[in-house]
């Protein structure tokens, strides 16, 4: 699913959905991003992971779109986890306090290990 420099791919795993993001997250990404989220929750996952490893650019509107996904996930009682952000965007997520509400991990393997530890504690 691609649109003006942005695309997604949703992968379903047992109890989780991973949304692979590619390209630029800006105004043009809104419909594609929301459709990917809808597809991800259609399988009733226990957690959603956002894979930013192929994201080239996120503008302020893109940050707002991520906040919108976070809001939807929180309303549904779903943890939203991000991984693969560049150092620059990790810093932006920390400055904007998104990282306070959405755990950030360097890669998918690290995110899965954290999820496994979290599941053991619950």
Regions found by a protein language model. Name each.
Residues 7, 101-103:
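Conserved beta-strand segments of alpha/beta enzyme cores
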Residues 27-101:
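Amphipathic alpha-helical interaction surfaces in cytosolic regulatory modules
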Residues 24, 91, 108:
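Acidic-residue sensor for enzyme active/binding pockets
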Residues 2-35, 52-54:
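STAS-typified acidic loop motif
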Residues 7-8, 47, 88, 116:
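Short leucine-rich amphipathic alpha-helices used at interfaces
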